[in-house]
Amino acid sequence: MTRVAILTREYPPEVYGGAGTHVEYLARELRRLTEVSVHCWGAPRDEPGVTNHQAWDALSEPKPEAAALQAMSINLAMAAAVKGVDVVHSHTWYANLGGHLAKLMWSVPHVMTIHSLEPLRPWKSEQLGGGYALSTFCEQTAIEGADAVVAVSKGVREDVLSCYPRVDPDRLHVIHNGIDPDIYKPQPSPETLARFGIDADRPFALFNGRITRQKGLPLLLAAALRLDPRHQLVIVASSPDTPEIAGEVAGLAQRVRDERGNLVWIDRFIPREDLIHLHTHADVFVCPSIYEPFGLVILEAMACETAVVASRVGGIPEIVVQGETGYLVDYNSDDTETFTTELAGRINELLTDNALARKMGKAGRRRVLDHFGWPAIAARTVELYDSLRPAVA
């Protein structure tokens, strides 16, 4: 049985994005097929086979650059801790360097999954300062030396080859993200709506995501000014990347409140159960990202039978079927006015036509059941592990 070490920043209960959710479910399914250990950041976990690693205190300054140096210190600890495994599998730049160092030290294959690419996220320089150059260095070093690179969408595969032309295309494998439809399924809860101050008698559009440039929240707030004022916009968003983006979003949100009202803002992390309830009652889920390698939040919405309006970027067109499970809106950074106008138009259409929204929502869940199950994803991943082992035997 192949012994696999998964290296990741996020792991339950410390999960804040799609990559962490991916690792959670992938590890669960892989354990049914092979031996798995997990190495993650943060506090100790009670789960067997999970080891936490923490940054060196001596690297706490200068800010914000120290964050990247702290990440590298955790990677050193991870690399040292995985001696004796057969395969190392890293996720995101926060753990990729650890996988690369483990490959060099212990002569084991390194598999890395690409959830996003640093060269395509220039706004991260606001958060990391000069540390952004280090995050890109970690990613590039690891991806060019990895034995196999998993792209979570065809769009990501193309992006890898564009950003890092030295990567051998034969080492790139597309294995889509997935979801557990037994967890994410329609679950009505009028009580949850009441608790968050959402009017159950008014249609509403839902956004769920971090306050970052990537997720396009400023664009959604601009589009909100064109939404029918009778309809509600519910936003679940917190953890801003920087004070600058926090201030910008707060100003836009206040303008929406002043000019149209019916904005419900949930500015904290909410349990998965509550989010599923919101998806179930929402008439449309909105994903206005300007960069989205895959879009796991879209799968979550579709699994709950919610129609989707999303940007036509990255891997999203591989999830949303135009006119069947929702609508895709073309994004052009040079013409955001057209984007926000068309985004608002599609949202208004689905908030007004309940029958169409329900039809698209049901089609979305069928698509999730047919194409995005975790057991098949884990099986393909184990096949990839096994294909690499003879090369280093």
Regions found by a protein language model. Give the residues of each.
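A conserved mid-protein helix/loop that constitutes part of the nucleotide-sugar donor-binding site
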Residues: T21, P203-R226, G247
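Short His-centered aromatic/hydrophobic patch
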Residues: S90-A95, I114
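Carbohydrate-associated surface elements
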Residues: G155, G178
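Nucleotide-activated donor-binding/catalytic signature segment of Leloir-type glycosyltransferases, i.e.
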Residues: A246-F269, E273
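Short alpha-helical donor nucleotide-sugar binding micro-motif in glycosyltransferases
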Residues: H277-A282
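Aromatic "clamp/platform" in nucleotide-sugar-dependent glycosyltransferases that forms part
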Residues: I290
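Short hydrophobic beta-strand element within catalytic cores of glycosyltransferases
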Residues: A307-A310, V320
